[in-house]
């Protein structure tokens, strides 16, 4: 519709008059030249009146985070909370799960949720503030910032009398770096890892609420010590490069900056956050999941870290005036939260992505127990709540156009995206947790585990319910000297030779070799039809095909006729169709964090092609 110039002139004149009548409103320009310029811009550049087509008008409310936090807390019964309190009261504070639980209860009470716990919360907070200054081996590096987050919310909402808040703050004045923190940098080149970043943020939060005098040397030492572990992409290298701890540490610096740090190391770290933030968009799956790889993976808190990073970057780009990019980050936030909500609908709620009883600790490291890691998801969702800008629309994400990205060799990952599918390849896995090969194949809307969400090692550092385990991924195999060699084996070497993206597809060529000059070449082609894999060898070629067999509660339906291997699970079907050769059951079972997988093999002389698809069940 054509906009009449005299209507725009009238609009500007009325606004100018309104500005003169309202001294609280900044005056709008109302010169004739400005009016003509505006009319010209309106008629000749109509895009200024519209959102980008990739941006939805849907806004995400901050209250969504509070609702998710409340749902997470519901995994703890009142009896469980009381028991936890009594244990800490009797035995002293020994870890940070209890302060995290306390802080999140306080935040929810401040928002009018779980007020039934108000009296018990006072006892819990009293115990936290009493115990924290007494210990240096209770992971105070993690806890203090979270206790302060709760105090800020309680103070803001006037949930308790000021005297009560000041009493809790007063207890935190007794904290000293030397007596209360165990791991921190004493010099810029100290060889300490992410605990130093946690200590940095906890101390900064003490400065923020004025219970400690600012010590910028301490803060700068922590920031400098962590910088030595940043790769060329701005990603943080914790020991053995676990994917989630890259996000954890970046998130801690985002908190530091959100609360005002602009010291010596701000610019370099902020640039790293910006650079890695863009790459995080490439690593997040179509299911909303963070990349697999290394320790602490496949827990619900993983996507909490992704959400806070995406919220931080969304706000950054909104400030820069790039609403398209800001909305893309918001779209990724929305997707990560959808993934958390999916798992929170499961009963009973678990902190790890499987359905095994909590008591088994299936899929968990020794340190990753329920009491600590369930509430951790809420802790970092609260940080995302702090960063959330409700005015940014949630953007539509493009999962159809082909895209590829390869990390630095420190993280040894290749990512493919096309046709609503997503694939992740680990070409030099950490065998404490993973195996090399294609460790993830997802389709948007489908369960992440139906094909594969993570690979598995033969000697996992997390609990499984089997004495003997087999390393597996979707990986090439080779028949050599009378035996099958697996690309998931520790001795296998994978090399990414090339990868490329086209309009609606993504592809890669990867070689796999073993000692003794055994070698295969494998081509991967991802499109709306799924993933096509072609293996070429100078002898019999194979491809390992994991079939999801048990999630801790449900046993998917598996069928194999030699040409088609199908897995039916949660109203979806994963199909492996062999173009040439035969699919055999190896008789082996593999165990990853998500559950059990029966291992099949596609076989053929010299060359084979398998087409993998994930489709709704008819």
Question: Where do the model's predicted regions map?
Answer:
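Extended polysaccharide-engagement surfaces of secreted carbohydrate-active enzymes
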Residues: 282-575, 581-586
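Charge-rich, solvent-exposed alpha-helical interaction surfaces
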Residues: 38, 68-75, 120-127, 167, ...
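Extracellular polysaccharide-recognition and catalytic grooves
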Residues: 138, 144-150, 170-404
């Amino acid at each position: 519709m054509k906009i009449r110039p005299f209507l725009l002139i009238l609009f500007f004149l009325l606004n100018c008059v309104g500005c003169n009548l309202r001294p609280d409103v900044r005056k709008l320009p109302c010169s004739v030249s400005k009016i003509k310029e505006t009319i010209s811009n309106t008629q000749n550049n109509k895009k200024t009146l519209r959102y980008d087509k990739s941006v939805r008008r849907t806004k995400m409310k901050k209250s969504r985070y509070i609702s998710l936090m409340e749902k997470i807390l519901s995994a703890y019964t009142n009896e469980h909370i009381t028991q936890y309190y009594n244990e800490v009261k009797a035995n002293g504070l020994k870890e940070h799960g209890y302060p995290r639980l306390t802080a999140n209860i306080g935040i929810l009470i401040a928002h009018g949720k779980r007020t039934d716990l108000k009296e018990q919360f006072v006892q819990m907070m009293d115990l936290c503030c009493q115990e924290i200054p007494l210990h240096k081996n209770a992971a105070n590096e993690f806890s203090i910032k979270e206790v302060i987050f709760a105090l800020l919310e309680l103070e803001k909402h006037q949930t308790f009398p000021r005297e009560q808040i000041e009493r809790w703050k007063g207890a935190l004045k007794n904290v000293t770096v030397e007596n209360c923190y165990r791991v921190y940098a004493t010099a810029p080149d100290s060889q300490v890892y992410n605990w130093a970043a946690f200590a940095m943020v906890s101390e900064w939060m003490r400065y923020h609420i004025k219970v400690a005098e600012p010590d910028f040397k301490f803060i700068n030492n922590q920031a400098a010590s962590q910088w030595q572990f940043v790769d060329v992409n701005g990603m943080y290298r914790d020991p053995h490069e676990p994917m989630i701890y890259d996000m954890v540490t970046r998130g801690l610096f985002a908190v530091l900056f959100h609360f005002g740090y602009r010291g010596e190391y701000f610019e370099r770290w902020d640039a790293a956050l910006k650079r890695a933030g863009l790459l995080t968009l490439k690593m997040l799956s179509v299911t909303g999941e963070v990349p697999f790889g290394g320790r602490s993976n496949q827990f619900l808190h993983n996507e909490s870290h992704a959400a806070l990073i995406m919220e931080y970057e969304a706000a950054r780009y909104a400030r820069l005036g790039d609403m398209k990019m800001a909305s893309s980050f918001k779209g990724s936030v929305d997707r990560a939260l959808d993934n958390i909500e999916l798992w929170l609908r499961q009963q009973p709620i678990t902190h790890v992505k499987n359905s095994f009883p909590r008591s088994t600790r299936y899929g968990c490291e020794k340190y990753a127990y329920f009491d600590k890691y369930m509430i951790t998801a809420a802790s970092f969702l609260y940080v995302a709540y702090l960063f959330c800008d409700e005015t940014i629309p949630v953007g539509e994400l493009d999962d159809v156009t082909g895209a590829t990205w390869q990390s630095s060799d420190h993280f040894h990952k290749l990512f493919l995206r096309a046709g609503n599918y997503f694939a992740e390849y680990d070409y030099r896995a950490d065998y404490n947790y993973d195996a090399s090969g294609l460790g993830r194949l997802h389709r948007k809307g489908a369960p992440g585990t139906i094909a594969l969400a993570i690979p598995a090692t033969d000697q996992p550092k997390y609990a499984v319910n089997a004495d003997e385990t087999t390393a597996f991924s979707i990986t090439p195999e080779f028949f050599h000297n009378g035996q099958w060699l697996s690309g998931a084996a520790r001795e296998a070497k994978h090399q990414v030779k090339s990868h490329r993206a086209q309009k609606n597809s993504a592809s890669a060529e990867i070689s796999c070799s073993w000692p003794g000059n055994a070698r295969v070449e494998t081509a991967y082609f991802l499109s709306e039809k799924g993933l096509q894999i072609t293996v070429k060898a100078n002898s019999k070629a194979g491809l390992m095909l994991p079939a999801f067999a048990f999630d801790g509660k449900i046993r998917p339906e598996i069928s194999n006729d030699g040409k088609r291997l199908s897995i039916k699970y949660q109203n979806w079907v994963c199909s492996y169709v062999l173009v040439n050769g035969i699919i055999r059951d190896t008789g082996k079972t593999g165990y990853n964090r998500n559950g059990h997988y029966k291992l099949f093999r596609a076989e053929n002389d010299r060359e084979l092609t398998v087409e993998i698809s994930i489709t709704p069940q008819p």
